[in-house]
Amino acid sequence: MRAVVIESYGGPEVLAICEVPAPEPGPDEVLVDVVASALNRADLLQRMGLYPGPSMEYEVPGLEFAGRVASVGEAVGRWLVGDEVMAITSGGAHAEQAVVHADQAMAVPAGMSLADAGALPEVFITAWDALVLQGGLQPGGTALVHAGASGVGTAAIQLCRSMGAEGGVTASGSKCAACTELGASLAVDYTTDDWLAAVRDHTGGRGVDVVLDVVGGDYLDRNVDALAVGGTIVQGGVMGGGKATFGLGKLLPKRATIVGTVLRGRSLDEKVAVSRAFADEVVPRFEEGMLRVVVDRRFDLDDIAAAHVHMEGNANVGKIALDVRTG
C-alpha cells in the first residue's frame, strides 16, 4: 500500500510517499481501506521528532481516518466488509489502509461523505472530551476556547451551541468573523484586543466555567483570571510554550481545577470508551444538522508536504483534509 513515511526528522521535505506492507488486523480489529484522513498539529510535531508515534516498522503519521471495512478479525461481530467507518488512531492513518480496534471504529454519520468524515474524529472527540468529560461543561454553561479557528476550535464552537452552552473564542483578524458565523458568542482578536477584559465584560465579571486552551505559555495566568468560581482549565496543547509562571494563590478562592489532556497516550480501553460515548451522544447531532465538519482546504495524499506547509502558515479556518483515494 502507499503511505506517508517520515524518513527522518525535520521540515516537510522529510515526508515521502512509499510502498509499505499493509497492516494485518488482529482478532479484535478491522482493516479499513482509507478514503480520507486529515492533518493535525500532532503530525507536524511528529515530523519534527517532538511527538513520538507508536512503534512501527515504518513511521506513518495520521491520527484519524474514514473509509470502508476491507476485512475483519475473527472475533469481530460489530462490522461487515464494506461498512463505512471512521476512527481515531494513534498513528498510521496517512496511508491507503489502516487497522483499528473494532470497538473504537464508529459508523460514518448518515448523509456524510467519507471525505468529510475523515476530518471529523480527532477534533470533535478532542473538543467534546475536553469540554464535557474533562471540563464538566453543562447546558447553560460558558466556555472560552483559544485558537477558535483551528480544527478543535471550530468543533468546540459548534459543540457548545449544540448543547445549549455559550462558547467564546480568541482568534486572529478575519478568523473572528468565521468563528461568529459558526455560533461563537464572543470572538476576540487576540492580536489587537485584551481578551481577558472582553471575557470579563461579556460575562458580567463572573468568568467562564471552562477554558479550553491549546496555547499554553503565558496564557495560563490569564486563563485563571478568566475562570468563574469552580471553573476548570483544560490544557490540550502548548503551541505557545510549555512553561508558565502564575500565582498559585489565584486558584484558592476560585476553587479552580487545571486538567491536562491528550488522546494519543490513552489506553485502548479509554479510547474505546470515549469513542463509543461520542458515537452515542454526539454523532446523531451531525445527522440532525446541528454539527458539520469545517474544511479549510483539501490536499491529495501525494501533496502531503504542501499540506504541512499550509498548516504551518496558520492561515486555515477549520480542518486541512487529505484525500487518500477516490470514492
Name every feature range the model reports, one short phrase each.
Residues 80, 110-113, 136-142, 205-206:
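Short helix-loop-beta connector
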Residues 118-193:
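Mid-domain Rossmann-like dinucleotide-binding core that forms the NAD(H)/NADP(H) cofactor-binding site
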Residues 218-290, 321-327:
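Glycine-rich phosphate-binding loop and adjacent beta-alpha segment
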